[in-house]
Amino acid sequence: MKEVVSTSNAPAAIGPYSQAIKANGFLFLSGQCPFDPRTGAIVGANAVEQATQVLNNMQAILEDQGLGFGDVVKVTCFIKNMGDFG
């Protein structure tokens, strides 16, 4: 059984998807953007600041479900400029 997960502590989905789906004891988070959940504005002028906001958004969704980063098994990261990697 699948359950849609949504919290006001993370940005609302901007398309036809959910913040996360809970299924069979797993939580699958959708891709996250560096948006402020209150204003919808992009946070951060550089990759570090934007990545920090993305992690904050992920943490809000995880915590809403009683989870934390220690429960994360896999992350896929898309980086526009590989010079920002590392």
Sequence positions of predicted segments:
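Short, polar/acidic, helix-capping and beta-turn segments at strand->helix junctions
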Residues: 1-86
